[in-house]
A protein has these predicted regions:
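Membrane-proximal, solvent-exposed terminal domains/tails of membrane-associated proteins
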Residues: 70-73, 77-96, 103-230
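Hydrophobic alpha-helical segments and helix pairs
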Residues: 30-72
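N-terminal low-complexity, intrinsically disordered segments
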Residues: 1-31, 38, 42
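Histidine/cysteine-enriched polar flanking segments
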Residues: 1-15, 53-58, 185, 208-217, ...
Length: 230
């Protein structure tokens, strides 16, 4: 807390203000699980040493309370950590040409990135959904010139998207257009043909998950959600 500014500020190497109160935080969970006793102890020890260095007073929560909270947070996150996919597969046995796939993806506004996936992004550059290969090869500009694949998969990472149902609608629209252009079929992960009713059910599930997150005060697609689901 800056004495001069009267506001909470992030401390950087070039900060010139004087601080009367400093708050430090530790992320309690991510996709690897809840924070453990060892990491928590190291964090608390570091805070003790920092306070001693500046002859300051320190307020710390009880370790067992933090660990209990971390486990509860991790359990909740695990319950809503869902990635939902829609596949477009070739049923004629000819395969999809990589050059045509790339053209269709780019025409739909998707960007090929270094992770081997096409990304649909919002106005801020955040990923809404991805398009990947069902085969072993990743998508790469050079590889796609000669690639032939039996199918592609569209994937939506539910906790990391602000408006999941809207992102899903766009994803399905692109998948349907691609299926029509390629002569493919929309199927789920078990290769069952996706009916309109099944697609509506998936959309409803996305909305339900994101509502649960909002109640837990983790806004889907927010900075907090991106930290927790990483």
């Amino acid at each position: 807390y800056g004495e001069g500014s009267g506001q909470w500020r992030t401390i950087t190497a070039h900060a010139a203000d004087r601080y009367s109160v400093v708050a430090a935080s530790l992320q309690l969970a991510d996709r690897r699980g809840a924070v453990g006793e060892t990491d928590l102890a190291a964090f608390l020890d570091g805070m003790h040493r920092l306070a001693q260095h500046f002859a300051g007073l320190i307020e710390l929560p009880a370790s067992h309370e933090v660990l209990t909270h971390a486990r509860a947070l991790d359990e909740f996150c695990a319950g809503v950590d869902v990635q939902l996919g829609v596949n477009v597969v070739d049923v004629a046995g000819n395969g999809f040409a990589g050059t045509k796939l790339r053209g269709l993806a780019e025409a739909a506004g998707l960007e090929l990135r270094g992770d081997g996936l096409f990304h649909a992004v919002d106005e801020y550059g955040a990923t809404l959904f991805t398009l990947g290969n069902l085969g072993p090869e990743i998508f790469d500009a050079d590889v796609m010139r000669t690639l032939t694949t039996a199918g592609v998969t569209f994937m939506l990472d539910v906790p990391r998207v602000a408006d999941g149902p809207a992102a899903f609608d766009r994803m399905v629209a692109v998948a349907r257009q691609m299926a029509q252009s390629l002569g493919g079929t929309l199927v789920d992960g078990q290769r069952h043909v996706l009916s309109d009713a099944m697609i509506a059910g998936i959309r409803a599930k996305i909305g339900e998950i994101q509502q649960q997150m909002a109640v837990y005060e983790i806004a889907p697609g927010s900075a907090r959600a991106l930290r927790l689901f990483s």
